[in-house]
Structure formats: structure tokens, C-alpha cells
Amino acid sequence: MEHEVTERLSVAGRVQGVGFRPSVCRMAKELKLTGTVQNLGGEVEIYITGAREKIDTFLCGLKQMERPALVECVKREERPLTPFSAFTSIPSRESENKMFAPADISVCSACLKEMKTQGNRRCHYPYISCTACGPRYTVLKKLPYDRENTAFDAYPLCDQCYEEYRDMNNRRCHGETIACHDCGPRLLAKMRGSPSAGPWSREELLQSAKDLLLHGEIIMVKSVGGYNLVCRGDRDDAVQRLRILKQRRDKPFALLVATVGEAEKLCHISREEKELLESPQKPIVLLKRRRESMPLISPAVTELTESLGVFLPPFGLYALLAEIKIPLVVTSCNFTGEPIIYKQADAFAFYESHESISALFYDEREILRPADDSVTRIAAGAVQILRRTRGYMPEPVAVEKKGMRVLALGGEVEPSFALSVNDLIYSAQVPSDLTLEKSSAFYRRLVADWEELLHISPDILVCDLHPCYTTAEESRKLAKELDVPVLEVQHHHGHALSVMAEHHLDGKCLAVIFDGTGFGTDGTVWGGEFLLCEDRSFIRVGAVKPISMISGDESVRQAWKSLLCHLVHSGIPSDDKRAAVVKAAVAGGLNTVKSSSMGRLFDAVSAALGLADYNTYQGRCAMLLENQAALAKRERKIPTELSFNEEVVETENGSVTFFDPAPLWEKVMGEDKAAAALGFHEAVIRIVERMAEKTGVETVILSGGCFANRLLLEGCVEALKGKGHAVYWNQALPPGDGGLAFGQAWYGMNTANERKSYVCSISGACGNH
């Protein structure tokens, strides 16, 4: 008989809400091992008895478990020999500081197959799920993740589902959100000119939804994390009516397609992009458009010709709707700047007040907190998350060192917040406009909800340096209530820290931070920054040369003002009738501020090329400029030769290299738009190369909203790696302000409890940035 031992295994990773414990039980029984498995909230604890060789085999199986499970770390220790009669799963218990809230997981292939199989008892059941898929975060009342702690507690299991739930050999064993036609949520509808709730059969409702879409109507659909508006994406009239309804003039829509094969009719798809489309998160993936796809979708879907946002069905109902084999526009049901509608009463009110919506399809399952669709892409050979919401939120990101409990409240433009405990940072992105009271109130509620859900009471708060951000004001208010200190982190340093935290960097690095705006330590507006970072400190060693820019939120949206300010600075005349007013304002210092913004420079070049004068949505002008540059690359155009002037200024903190874009303007205007757009991108890449060469630092960080630009990111990565640099950028977190709170939290985790002060020389800072 083989010598037996007992071991305790502590397993960390994505092991909650993914059918991990039943899989562990099956594996142990196959190997004739005995013991127990228990969910501790943030990890899984296994006691296992058997031959050491079999336990080794068991461990290998754990690490190779299929997604969505992901084993990141196993701590193994021998314990006194303990005889067990069998291998069993025992009830969950909470573990101090080990709370883990699982993310929603898109419908899996096994459930899709069942849902589309005639005769299966879940055939055409829109809310099908198993241990490998289904809602989690959006239906979770409290931890640990057990059925009685979710919105599915309102749906007692029928006898058949209960047997599946108990059967350790069934893939629905301990599936906390499993249901069927007999015991789970039901598809319901409101239709114009029909009785308020039917009665209609499930098949009638599904067919009605498909028929309405085929006829070009707009329908409202309850998804996993909120309500969506849906129409067919190949009809101009339908998409234009949707734009009017949403008050969304230009911002691109994403398209839902049934399969990767359908997506390939519209876009070029690499192996990595296919994996991302089919991943458990089912995010929107930004893909390169096929030229032949133009007739297949309405031009009203997007004004961009080179890229398209596409995603596969994240849950059963969308998989059934996508069977019509027409690309569907799916967008959040809200107005621009407001959070997605997720409460039933609000959804009913929205439907009743908008007659252009032909029907509302819903169920009575309660959504406890919303989650918009995530947005991703493959860039420089890696996944880049641009919006980290459904499927990713609230899963934490592990950092290298344990630290204090921190609440970080991010910036202003792309609201986010983060909570940290031990070596984990939980980061949330809140797509909304905090200048709107409804959005600001929602943001505050969500912060409080996460604190309660994760059992985290912060020891310290961290906010942006800008004195008048809503989030900074909220930080000061909360700090007073909780009697804890507040740390302020300079905006671009926060971006740098987000990359350092994600990639476990603490040595000296050059951080290249390009974005639209951020309050600088000198009281001016920063945005085209080169920061020499080490540990948690930084020195500004370079920047786009600051010029006088007309301030105010509206001016930030007006690319033509950015252009005219640059022309005034460069001494280049303009025949624009508005130029005289701008020149006088700059000369007199009237409502102006010094700015080194790279984002505003992208806007100015876009306006100079006649691509766009106004940001009707965030980043529009820069996206159109990138689109033209991508067009030039596809058509193999020779880029216009453009350059910056370089000058060195001595300051009390050392030398600062400024890059003046003045030489750009005479060459840009009047040139081939696509060639000039590509030339501008290459000029920016060259100044990044130049600063890396000047500083001699091996490690380079790329962050800030401008690095959502794939051409810029990939160009910088390729150029820097070609010169032997180690290059890091945001991948698990967004490069823009959506990832800012993550960097702030990391700063706070490892900083003494004292307020950090910066000297600011600007007057009237509020409202000028």
C-alpha cells in the first residue's frame, strides 16, 4: 500500500462562481483521493489525503483546469495524517480580508448547444446558465457567492434543477444561478398597442422580437447588467432613429453578431482577436474593418472606416435574437453621460416615454448593480482593455506588496474608483458624466455598495491633485466623515503608477503619459508628459511645449480653438474669421491657461486637416485622425515628414526638454489628409524615442488616454523595443482615466498616513481645466 499523507492546499485565482469546487470533487474522486473543499470567500481551501504521487497529479489537474476557472497560485503544506471517508464539498464561509466577488460570465458553448437543441428541457430558455457561465456580480446581494445571497433566491429550484444542483457529476452542481422554464425568470414583454403583459408564449415573444428587428424597429431588451436598445445595423433609417432617441450624434455603435464567422464577414480577425471575442467575458472587440463590409452595415453605425466594434452574444436571449443573421446595433439604454438604466421601474418609464421603441422584452430578475459592455482590442500583441466593466468587474488585480486599505476615487472625465485590501486592488469603471447630478449620485451609491459588498473600510483616501474635481471634493468629504487622511496624486503620475502596479515595477522608469488634461504641480495644465519615476516619486523631465490655450470645458471640446491657439503660438496667420478673437484672448491672457496637452494637439491636427472641428463625444477628433493614419498605412502612402522643435530649459528640479509643435503647421495644412495624419503619428513616436534615448532609462511606461490609439501605442512599442527598451503599458486596466484610480490606490497602499502637498500657482483653477 502506498504511503499516504494529508495536505492543505490554499488556491487563489478565479476560483469563485465558476464551478471550481464540483470540478475539484470530480478530479479527487477519479484519483481516489479523500478530503474536503471549501470556499473561503477569496480563495478555496482543500484538505486532501492520499498518495503523494496522486496529490501531485491532482495539483497538475488544478492548474490545467479549463476557463473560466483560472488558478493563479497554490500554497501547499503538509498536515497530520487525517483519514476522510470520501471527498466532499462543505459549505462556504467568509475569511477575514479574503472576500472575492465574482464577475458575470457570458453564456458558455455547452449551454448554447442545449438552448438550441429541440427536445432539451432548456430549449430556447433565454436565461440558461451553469457553473461555467451566467450572472454573478450583477445579482449578488452579499458574499459569499451562494444562491441565497443572490437575486436568484427569489426563484426556488424545481425538482429537476435541484437534482442537478446536488449531483457532483453534473456541470450544474452548485451552479448558484441555474434555472429552467419551470422555476426561473420568464421572458415578458410590453408591446405598443397590445395588452401590457400579454399573454404570450415564450416562442411567440421570441418570434415577435425577431420580426420587429427584421422590420427595422427599435426594441428595448433587458440584458445581464442593464437595459439595451437594439436595432438592425444594416438599415440607415433604423440606426438614425436610434441616434435621435439616444441623442447620440456621432459616437460609433458596436455590433452584435451570432458567430465569429459572421464577424469575419465584417472584419479581419486574428487568432488572438478570435480568442478574445470568444472569451468568457464576451467583450466588445475593436477590429480592423474589411473594405467589402461597407455595404453590409449602415454608414450611420460609425463614421470610422478602418475599425469596428463587434461582440458575440453574452447571454442566451441575445444568442436567440442573433439567429436572424443580421448585425445588430446594441447600445446602453440611457442618455449621453447618464448611467445605464438597470431598475425595472426606470426601464418601464423610459419605454413609455419613447414611442420610437416598439417593444420592451424583459424578465423580473432583479439587477442589483449595473454593468455596461466592456471594450477591448488586441494591440502590440496583447489584450488591451479600454473599458473594464461587464465580465471583468469586480475581479481584483493582484499587486506585489500588501498595504493599507485604500479608497481611491480616480479623476473626472472617465469616472472610476478602486478599493484595496492586502495585495488586491478592486477597480470599478463608471461610464457616466459626474457633472450630472444623476450620475454623481449613482457614483456615490456604487462606491458605498462596493465598500459594503467587499467588507472594506478604508484607512486612507486618495484623489487627484485637481482641487475642483467632483471626486476630489467627495474624497475630502468622506475623509472627514471617516476621520482618515487624504492623499493627492498628480494626475499623470497616477497614470504612471497604474502601469507600475499592474506590471509590478518599482525601479527607475521613464513614463510617457499622453492625454487631454491633468492638473500639474506647477498649476498649469499638463498632458504631454515625460516623467522619470522611481518607487512612488517622479520628476518631470520633458513635455510638449506649453502654450496659452483658451480654458473652459466647452473649449476642450472645440478642436478649432485648439488649432487657432497653436497657430497664434507659432505665428502662423489664419483666414478663419474666429482667429482674431482667439488671438486677442491669448495676447491678453483672457480666460487662458498654459497647457502641454497632447490630446489637444491631436485635436488641433485633426481640425487642421479638416477632419473635425468639434468633439461631439470624447476623443472624436483624435479617433478620426487615427482613422486617417490607418487608411494611409493600408494604402501604403508615404507619410508627410513632420517634426517638433526641441529645446531644453533649466529648472530648480533639473533640465526639462520641451517639444514645440510649431514646425508642424505649415506642412500639415494643404497636405494629403491621410499622409499628414500618419506623418503626425510618426513625429510623436520619434519624440518618445528621443526622450528614451536622452534619459538612458531602460524601462519605459506608456499610459494616458492617447494610448487608446492603437497606431500610436504599437508604433511606440515597436520603436522602443527596437532600441532595446523594456516597454510596459496598461493591459488589464484602461490607459485613460478609467484606470487612474488603480494607480492611485497602489500609491496609497504603500504611503505613510500623511497628506501629500503640492504648491500650485494657478488662480481660479476650478473650471479652467
How should each PLM-predicted stretch be described?
Residues M1-T177, H181:
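Intrinsically disordered, low-complexity, mixed-charge
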Residues E78, I218, G226-R291:
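A phosphate-binding glycine/aspartate-rich beta-alpha loop in the early core of alpha/beta enzymes
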Residues M500-G571, A587, T592-S596, F602-A608, ...:
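Active-site histidine-anchored catalytic micro-motif
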